[in-house]
UniProtKB/Swiss-Prot annotation:
It holds the Pfam family PsbU. One of its GO terms (biological process) is photosystem II stabilization. Its main location: membrane. GO terms for cellular component: extrinsic component of membrane; photosystem II oxygen evolving complex; plasma membrane-derived thylakoid membrane. The keyword Signal applies. Keywords: Electron transport, Membrane, Photosynthesis, Photosystem II, Signal, Thylakoid, Transport. It is a peripheral membrane protein. Belongs to the PsbU family. NCBIfam families: PRK02515.1. This is Photosystem II extrinsic protein U. It comes from Synechococcus sp. (strain CC9902). It comes from the Bacteria. It is found in: Cellular thylakoid membrane. One of the extrinsic, lumenal subunits of photosystem II (PSII). PSII is a light-driven water plastoquinone oxidoreductase, using light energy to abstract electrons from H(2)O, generating a proton gradient subsequently used for ATP formation. The extrinsic proteins stabilize the structure of photosystem II oxygen-evolving complex (OEC), the ion environment of oxygen evolution and protect the OEC against heat-induced inactivation.
Length: 132
């Protein structure tokens, strides 16, 4: 009786394993879906906002780290700019409490900045200071 029970259990396990090879799994995506949604066609709010700034640093939506490319601005002046927003135009930065040296630095790099409306996707959670 024990031998019969072990043979039946073995046969049941083998049948289950073989059926898993025959039946399609639910995790495979259909080929037409892979072709339809692969590539650069998928975009989200953040991608659109990044494309909107055209390679410049957006004063309302950039983190402090984006200012590292400008010598003398990171981290002190960049922190002041990030915390001082939102801005309506680039020249609003000059209304901050900046030293003369910092104002000269900003004027030097002014053409590298732009202002777009603040986006909640880029400003949520105060990640602009330490986006680690």
């Amino acid at each position: 009786m024990k031998r019969l029970l072990s043979w039946l259990t073995g046969a049941l396990v083998m049948a289950g394993l073989l059926s898993s090879l025959v039946l399609p799994s639910a995790v495979y995506a259909e080929e037409d879906l892979l072709g339809k949604y692969s590539g650069s066609e998928i975009r989200n709010v953040v991608d659109d906002k990044i494309a909107e700034r055209e390679g410049k640093v957006d004063l309302n939506n950039s983190s402090v780290r984006r200012f590292q490319q400008f010598p003398g601005m990171y981290p002190t002046m960049a922190g002041k700019i990030v915390l001082g927003g939102p801005y309506n135009n680039v020249d609003d930065v000059l209304e901050l409490d900046l030293s003369e040296r910092q104002k000269e630095l900003f004027a030097k790099y002014r053409d590298n900045f732009t202002v777009t409306p603040p986006s909640i996707a880029l400003n949520e959670g105060d990640d602009r200071i330490n986006d680690g």
